[in-house]
Structures are given as structure tokens and as C-alpha cells.
Amino acid sequence: MTSVDCTAYGPELRALAARLPRTPRADLYAFLDAAHTAAASLPGALATALDTFNAEGSEDGHLLLRGLPVEADADLPTTPSSTPAPEDRSLLTMEAMLGLVGRRLGLHTGYRELRSGTVYHDVYPSPGAHHLSSETSETLLEFHTEMAYHRLQPNYVMLACSRADHERTAATLVASVRKALPLLDERTRARLLDRRMPCCVDVAFRGGVDDPGAIAQVKPLYGDADDPFLGYDRELLAPEDPADKEAVAALSKALDEVTEAVYLEPGDLLIVDNFRTTHARTPFSPRWDGKDRWLHRVYIRTDRNGQLSGGERAGDVVAFTPRG
């Protein structure tokens, strides 16, 4: 696991967070502009780790920042039970960390059809949530590359923890294509590389249709044959050709074999390289007592893979266009 202990940087990070507007949702563009300015002053070792990860990625496909400043549990609001967050909600420390770290990496992005087009998402258990939703708790959220079916798929998924689940059993699972690729034979690699396969989309992107079918085309592996990007979704990728099904099954098995579990604690921030990994979450049991697991999520776009065409700003909200 690639991780950075940020405990020693607490005073500096709190000082940087104090420079940010107190109600980020009131003017998110201004908040993220301020975060970009402040991110230039991140502690040297942390800044270097982020810049290196952004430029090169890692074998693990993720970077875990531990020991970031966070409120004491008693000082946090109750875990949310609805979304989106109120516009006047005061800035939480882990939201500030997502602003600083995210602006060091790229541009925070909202997706119009998802979470009312908001950029900052609260992730919490919700009774009766759809099995494909991050709000599930008591069922496995299966492996998926976030929005692999979206032309403007984010480069990074960032998850910051303000409150862990009571039993500390919820694990974020991450599997890296850089680790899985050596487990695939040459024939399987060749079959998967740059081959478009039918893919369904998440509920939010179905336009109110219960089951529109596989409206996107996703390449399971693409780019450099020796260091490819990954497009994988265990629930939504729907190959039809028997040889394609066999190759995807081999990829799925390889990803299972290289899976790492990350147990997020308060003050942890996980950066997932969404072009080289797939991630999941194990079940946990909420108590519905106002103190259940509470993460904050943002999506970051960079200039890789045609995500940016010029003129974009951190805080932009983009519309859905399926990959084809």
C-alpha cells in the first residue's frame, strides 16, 4: 500500500484550511480557486508525493494520506441522511483537505446527472439504496472503474473520512491493472486491448429509463500495451462474444488476485487512480444512530485522455456523453 503519514503536517494543514472560505457551496468556484492558491503551499514532502503520483501513478494505483487533521467525533454534525448538503453548511476539515489535495492534482468536477450535479458528495449509508449506489451498506458494492462509460470519466476518485463505521469492518477494495496485467497471458491481453465492448450505465445516467441496455462501449484495456489503462465494471460491462466473455473473466480473476483492502479511519484521504484501477466496498452494518460512516467524495479531471479541451475550471459540471 502506498501511503503518506501526514500527522506531522497537522499545524500547517490547519493553517492552509483556515485560508479557505467557510461556506464552500455558496460560491464553489471561489472556494476552489482559493484552494488552488493554498495548495501551492502544501508541505514539501506531501506536495512531492502528490506531484509524483499525478505524473507517474503507482503500482498500487492509489495513494493513501493518513493522519490529516479532522474534527473530533463529538464536534462533527450527525452523519447526513439526505443529499445534497445544504448550501450554507460550514466547511468541514476533511472537505478542506479534499479542496487542497484535489487542486494540487487537477480540477474538481461535478456530473450533471449525478447527485443533482453537485461537486462535493457526502457518502453515507441509506436504507433501501440501489445495489449499484455508494449509499449501499449491507451488500458488497462490486468492483467498478468509476464512470468508465462516460467520455469525461474522472482521472481520480478521492474519498476522505470524517467518521468510520462503528465496527471498522468497511473496506475500500482497490485492484490495479499494473499488478493484474502480468497475470494475463498474451492472447487475453491482445483480446482486451482497444476492443470496444457493450457496457450499461449507472442508474443516474439512464435518463429515467429503467433499463436502457448497453448504451456505451468500453475498452477493458486501452493505451500503451505494456502499461494500459483499465475500463472495468463487474456489474455493467456486458461482453457478448464468447471470446470477449472469456477474456473479461480472466481479467476479473486477475483483479481479484491483486486486490488490496483499505480501511478508512477519520483523517484518511484515499486517492484512487481511476484510469488504472477498479474499486469496491465491503458490506458493513449501520446503526442509524447519527454516527454511521461518513465519507466525502470528489472527482478530479486532468489533461489525460481527452478529459479537458481548454477553458475548464475547477467546479464545472459536465453533462453525460456515453463512450462509443
From Swiss-Prot:
GO molecular function per UniProt: clavaminate synthase activity; iron ion binding
Superkingdom of the source species: Bacteria
Signal peptide residue numbers: none
Note accompanying the cofactor annotation: Binds 1 Fe(2+) ion per subunit.
Name of one Pfam family that matches: TauD
Principal EC category: oxidoreductase
Residues reported in the UniProt entry to bind Fe cation: H144, E146, H279
Transit peptide found in the keyword field: no
Pathway: Antibiotic biosynthesis; clavulanate biosynthesis; clavulanate from D-glyceraldehyde 3-phosphate and L-arginine: step 3/8; Antibiotic biosynthesis; clavulanate biosynthesis; clavulanate from D-glyceraldehyde 3-phosphate and L-arginine: step 5/8; Antibiotic biosynthesis; clavulanate biosynthesis; clavulanate from D-glyceraldehyde 3-phosphate and L-arginine: step 6/8
Keywords of this entry: Antibiotic biosynthesis, Iron, Metal-binding, Oxidoreductase
Entry EC number(s): 1.14.11.21
Catalytic reaction(s) noted: deoxyamidinoproclavaminate + 2-oxoglutarate + O2 = amidinoproclavaminate + succinate + CO2; proclavaminate + 2-oxoglutarate + O2 = dihydroclavaminate + succinate + CO2 + H2O; dihydroclavaminate + 2-oxoglutarate + O2 = clavaminate + succinate + CO2 + H2O
SUPFAM superfamilies attached to this UniProt entry: Clavaminate synthase-like
GO terms of biological process kind: antibiotic biosynthetic process; clavulanic acid biosynthetic process
Cofactors, names only: Fe(2+)
Family from the record: Belongs to the clavaminate synthase family.
Protein name: Clavaminate synthase 1
UniProt source species: Streptomyces clavuligerus
